[in-house]
Amino acid sequence: MATAIPDVQSAWVNVARGTPDKALAFKEDWPVSKNLSDGEVLVKVHAAALNPVGYKLFRILPNFVAGRPRVAEYDLSGMVVESKDDRLKVGDHVYGWIPSNMFRKTDQGALAQYARVPADALVIRPANVTPVQAAGLTLTGLTAYDIICKTAKVGSGQRVFVNGGSTAVGAFAIQLAKIRGAKVVASASASKESFVREMGADEFVDYTKVDLPKYLTEKYSTSKFDYIVEAVGISDPSLYTRSDAYLSPKGAFISVGPQPTGMTTSELWNIAKTSLAMVRPKIVGGNKAPFKNVIVINDLADAIEFRRYVADGSLKPIVDSVYEFKDALKAYERLMTGRAKGKVVVKVDPSVD
């Protein structure tokens, strides 16, 4: 017998601009979005994963841009409880994300008991992955997939440098590059070396102990990288502007894009310097290898292919820590330390693992 779907639910709602403790409110009467269109499903959320871009947008965007109030976050896992789709049925255990167009349309994010989601943004959760593990696979996983498998098309024997190997995108990028036969060098702080090597990195660089562009020049100028993956965000433009010394001109510098925390003067200046370097012609000192930004878009075919790596065990989910639903603010505190190794997950349904 099907469980009745309630009219209201508990949810963490972004109600104001600021840090998560000021921006979010726990509501117990947020409406459940039930009016499904064709190709949509209603998911009973089991777990939701946090993304750094979420709390950064809390701080940066004014209300009229952010569309507040709105339930926070994008990544989730759960069970389909209502369906207007031919592929996904009631009772299917799924994971995926809420794309930005649906987010704006419904004001419904992942940090709630129920979420209305386009069916093509979800795939069936493999049996070898728990709901908590699955919650954090999509946004960062598909970003890494786009970088390694579509933009770079990394092949066997190629050399890849991942800046930020302990970030979720970086850890997925390392694994995907190794699956495709590449040699991977990755950076992180010393405390994360074992984690980065566990992901598959062949060599490790402690970025806190060296001038990174200088170190890469000294060690890799005669064996240049085919691709550089900037998984941190544009924190140091010199990694690109000095990359002719260690990046093949036939390769590319591929970034997750700017990740400002508060639009400080230094952050804006770094973005400006990188933007200028991106468009400067080679004839007047521009870099030989192109700079490419990757922004993930909803693509079911990509999600299915990425899922295949998860299902066969060649790609590991990356969970740093797990918090109960009412402790979501503590989860954000963990994320904001910058010390998380992989995904910070909020368990919405206390009965799942």
Q: Where would I find each of the regions flagged by the language model?
A:
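Glycine-rich beta-strand-centered segment in the early N-terminal region that forms part
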Residues: 31-50, 59-102, 108-109
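N-terminal Rossmann-like NAD(P) cofactor-binding module of classical short-chain dehydrogenase/reductase
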Residues: 95, 228-229, 254
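Short amphipathic alpha-helix with an adjacent loop that forms part of the alpha/beta core around
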Residues: 211-223
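Glycine-rich phosphate-binding loop and adjacent beta-alpha segment
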Residues: 235-314, 349-353
